[in-house]
UniProtKB/Swiss-Prot annotation:
UniProt cross-references to InterPro entries, sorted A to Z: Aminotrans_IV, Aminotransferase-like, B_amino_transII, BCAT-like_C, BCAT-like_N
Co-factor requirement: pyridoxal 5'-phosphate
Induction line: Expression is positively regulated by the apicidin F cluster-specific transcription factor apf2 that binds to the eight-base-pair motif 5'-TGACGTGA-3' called the 'Api-box' that is found in all promoters of the apicidin F cluster except in the promoter region of apf2 itself.
Protein name: Aminotransferase apf4
Pathway the protein takes part in: Secondary metabolite biosynthesis
Pfam families: Aminotran_4
Record: residues binding pyridoxal 5'-phosphate: 88, 228
Record GO terms (molecular function): branched-chain-amino-acid transaminase activity
Family indicated by similarity: Belongs to the class-IV pyridoxal-phosphate-dependent aminotransferase family.
Taxonomic lineage of the native organism: Eukaryota, Fungi, Dikarya, Ascomycota, Pezizomycotina
Native source species: Gibberella fujikuroi (strain CBS 195.34 / IMI 58289 / NRRL A-6831) (Bakanae and foot rot disease fungus)
Top EC category: transferase
Domain of life: Eukaryota
EC number: 2.6.1.-
Length: 378
């Protein structure tokens, strides 16, 4: 059984950047009474059946992930670092009092979701990828703040195009609110960390307010250390001539109130393979002026250069080379590994288990039956 080619009727050059119809998603259910997960089931619908009093809707008991799949020139489909995303997902679930999804189940659901939607993985020569969105939430009906009787884990997928590509980021330091408390939920991937940011980022993007493309968050206690961008980690590079060293110094801004960035970890590993010096540490806001290049690093953005960070209260403008040699080398290497163009010496990519999870005879067309469910055996 061969992997389907990209959907012949899909408008790859003009598709919606928000949501596009695909074949369906994967679901499985955890029962607190038995402390066990059901087998994955493929649901040919984009919708969930959820009671309005579910804790995931009322009390924010939910966590999510984001990872990518790419099509190679030989029509293989590679999923990038799914085991690492599984580990981060388990951490996020534990923070909001949910049962962690075992790695084997997480991987099975991810592979099934991609396999059953394989024709929606963009062509190899296209700039996009398939974005994979695992989600877990408390799903049983209840009013009280008790442990739910039921949790739902699901995996959705979407063809995805980088919205900004290599366009340099212009960021504003967020000074009017704190994204995360020092000992709060900032280091896990939960919706409550992102919803409050939206009105502030929308306001910052207005032309009359400077037209900033992103917010940079700082620590809530001292307002002086970098946490992260709203949806990406911050990495800075000092060139050898700045530090009188033989190699560049790559610094990842570390914060206990920011999520562990798998993309940043990948960039660090690549930089180390180049022989560069790597640091993971607290970065003071004022230290930004010492970097020659700064990147926003995350799943959706991969690596995006930053040209300017503005600290409004002090009037400081931190400027950086926006298309520098360090960015170019790191981005080309990471992108090449993800697309199968460069040897994956780090063993990050998993080949899609299509023989195991693909469905024979599928015609590649989104179904009109939103109730059809395909069960996988226990």
């Amino acid at each position: 059984m061969s992997i389907p080619l990209p959907h012949a009727e899909f408008q790859w050059d003009h598709y919606d950047s928000k949501v596009n119809p695909v074949n369906g998603h994967v679901e499985c259910t955890y029962r607190t009474l038995t402390c066990s997960w059901s087998a994955p089931r493929f649901v040919e619908s984009p919708f969930l059946q959820v009671h309005g009093l579910a804790p995931g809707l009322n009390y924010g008991q939910q966590a999510f992930e984001g990872l990518l799949a790419h099509r190679t020139a030989r029509n293989r489909i590679l999923i990038f670092r799914p085991a690492s995303h599984s580990s981060r997902f388990r951490h996020s679930a534990s923070v909001v009092s949910m049962p962690p999804v075992p790695e084997s189940l997480f991987l099975a659901c991810v592979h099934m979701a991609v396999a059953r939607n394989a024709e929606f993985v963009p062509p190899h020569n296209f700039a996009g990828n398939m974005y994979i969105r695992p989600l877990e939430f408390g799903s049983s009906a209840q009013i009280g703040l008790d442990v739910p009787d039921e949790f739902t884990f699901c995996v959705f997928v979407q063809p995805h195009v980088p919205l900004h590509g290599h366009t340099p980021l212009r960021a504003l330091v967020a000074e009017e609110f704190d994204r995360a408390a020092t000992r709060g939920t900032g280091n896990c991937k939960v919706g409550g960390n992102y919803g409050p940011v939206l009105k502030w980022s929308k306001d910052a993007k207005k032309p009359e307010n400077g037209g900033w493309s992103a917010l940079l968050h700082v620590d809530s206690k001292t307002q002086s250390y970098v946490d992260e961008f709203s949806a990406a980690a911050l990495i800075g590079v000092k060139s050898p001539d700045q530090e009188s060293t033989q190699v560049p110094i790559l610094t990842v801004a570390h914060s206990e109130a920011a999520i562990h960035s798998i993309t940043a970890e990948s960039v660090v590993t690549i930089a180390q393979s180049f022989g560069w010096t790597v640091e993971r540490r607290l970065v003071k806001l004022e230290e930004l002026s010492s970097f020659s290049e700064v990147f926003a690093v995350g799943t959706a953005a991969t690596i995006r250069p930053c040209s300017l960070i503005y600290h409004r209260s002090t009037g400081k403008h931190f400027t950086f080379t926006s298309d520098g040699p360090y960015y170019q080398r790191l981005w080309k290497t990471l992108s090449g590994i993800q697309k199968g163009e460069i040897e994956d010496i780090f063993q990050w990519c998993q080949d899609l288990r299509f023989e195991e999870f693909g469905e024979r005879g599928h015609n590649g067309q989104p179904t009109a039956d939103p109730t059809r469910v395909i069960e996988m055996p226990e």
